[in-house]
Amino acid sequence: MSGSTGERSFADIITSIRYWVIHSITIPSLFIAGWLFVSTGLAYDVFGSPRPNEYFTESRQGIPLITGRFDSLEQLDEFSKSF
């Protein structure tokens, strides 16, 4: 070994009691926070994605598919009006 930086080795860290006391609380907390973020619908609001029941409205039941090569801007305008 050429030199030491004075840092603890990874094996020392993960075998310490303090590591597991801290991480036994933080790791499950992250999973619970993520589950709440998605299950409450906050993820839809934050990222602006439509909720599962908002993909197709009563007036628009078809898929917004661009079919024309040269009139694509007009088709996009039609699709944006239906939102």
Curated annotation (Swiss-Prot):
SUPFAM superfamilies (alphabetical): Cytochrome b559 subunits
Q: What does this protein do?
A: This b-type cytochrome is tightly associated with the reaction center of photosystem II (PSII). PSII is a light-driven water:plastoquinone oxidoreductase that uses light energy to abstract electrons from H(2)O, generating O(2) and a proton gradient subsequently used for ATP formation. It consists of a core antenna complex that captures photons, and an electron transfer chain that converts photonic excitation into a charge separation.
Top-level taxon of origin: Eukaryota
- What are the GO cellular component annotations? chloroplast thylakoid membrane; photosystem II reaction center
- Keyword list, A-Z: Chloroplast, Electron transport, Heme, Iron, Membrane, Metal-binding, Photosynthesis, Photosystem II, Plastid, Thylakoid, Transmembrane, Transmembrane helix, Transport
Cofactor remark from the record: With its partner (PsbF) binds heme. PSII binds additional chlorophylls, carotenoids and specific lipids.
Regarding the membrane, this protein is recorded as:
Single-pass membrane protein
- Please state which protein family the record places this protein in: Belongs to the PsbE/PsbF family.
Q: Know the name of this protein?
A: Cytochrome b559 subunit alpha
Q: Which cofactor does it need?
A: heme b
What are this entry's molecular-function GO terms? electron transfer activity; heme binding; iron ion binding
Report if keyword Glycosyltransferase is assigned. no
Gene name on record?
psbE
Q: How does it assemble?
A: Heterodimer of an alpha subunit and a beta subunit. PSII is composed of 1 copy each of membrane proteins PsbA, PsbB, PsbC, PsbD, PsbE, PsbF, PsbH, PsbI, PsbJ, PsbK, PsbL, PsbM, PsbT, PsbX, PsbY, PsbZ, Psb30/Ycf12, at least 3 peripheral proteins of the oxygen-evolving complex and a large number of cofactors. It forms dimeric complexes.
- Output one GO BP term: photosynthetic electron transport chain
One short Pfam name that applies is Cytochrom_B559a
Q: Which residues bind heme?
A: 23
Q: Which NCBIfam families match?
A: cyt_b559_alpha (TIGR01332)
Q: Which HAMAP family match?
A: PSII_PsbE (MF_00642)
Main location as per UniProt: plastid
Q: Does the keyword Transmembrane apply?
A: yes
> Record's PROSITE patterns?
CYTOCHROME_B559 (PS00537)
Localization, per the record, is: Plastid, Chloroplast thylakoid membrane
Kindly list the residue ranges recorded as spanning the membrane: 21-35
